[in-house]
Amino acid sequence: MKLVKTIIKPERFEFVKKAMEEKGFKGMTITEVKGRGEQKGITLEYRGGLMTVDLLPKIQIEIVVRDSDTDSLISTITESARTGKIGDGKIFVIPVEKSIRIRTGETEA
C-alpha cells in the first residue's frame, strides 16, 4: 500500500475531488495547510502599501491506496490539479506497512 499525500491550490480542490470520485477514489483526509515552494509567496497591494505573504493557503489530501492503484491516482490528481502555473502543488508517495480499521480490527498489509 501507498500513502499518496498531495498539496494543491485550494481553488483546484473541488476539481480534484470530483475527478478522484469518478475514478473510484472516495475515501480521503483533507487538511487546510499553509506553505510555499518554488512560488516563495506573493506580494499584494494592501491599503496603499505592498505586503508580502510568504506562506500561502493550500489543501493537503491524503489517501492510502493499493500499490496497483498508485499510478492511476497520481494521473487523476495531476490532470485535475494542473493549471500550468507556479504553485500547482506537489505529490508525495510514501510506503504504508499496514492499516488497521479501528471499528472492526481488520488489518490490511
Task: Show where each model-derived region lies.
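Positively charged, small/polar-rich N-terminal and surface patches that mediate targeting and assembly
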Residues: M1-A109
